[in-house]
Amino acid sequence: MKVTGYYVIVAALLALALRAGPSLAADDRNQDCGPATSDPRANLNGADKAHSAEHTQDFNCQDTPAEEGECYECVLPPEVRIEGAEVIDVADRNFYPRKTLLLARMIRHH
């Protein structure tokens, strides 16, 4: 009976995985080039794009130290303060846009 239950659970998990589609890990990142090539700002209207460009010359914030915080003003909600964020490792910057990773870490810690 236990063996049958095991197969039922495995089959259900497999069915859920197949219905969910591609893995979250299978994104459009090029492992050799660094951050994802897709630009989340593509869906912004003109005013939002201008506001975002005002705070960051480089969308991925590769050249701006995390301590300065200018890169994150358009991403973080007003109630979140930059002082509470973790410093991001250089290794992380090779694969992820810095501000996206920072936002994910802040949500996890607060």
Curated annotation (Swiss-Prot):
Q: State the source organism's domain of life.
A: Bacteria
What are the alphabetically sorted keywords of the record?
A: Nodulation, Periplasm, Plasmid, Signal
Sequence segments annotated as region (Disordered): 27-64
Query: In the UniProt record, does the keyword Amino-acid biosynthesis occur?
Result: no
Which residue intervals are annotated with compositional bias (Basic and acidic residues) in the record? 48-57
Signal peptide, first to last residue: 1-25
**Main location as per UniProt:** periplasm
Name where it's found.
Periplasm
Q: Name one GO cellular component term.
A: periplasmic space
* Keyword Signal on entry: yes
Full protein name: Nodulation protein NolE
Specify the species: Rhizobium leguminosarum bv. phaseoli
Q: What is the lineage of its organism?
A: Bacteria, Pseudomonadati, Pseudomonadota, Alphaproteobacteria, Hyphomicrobiales
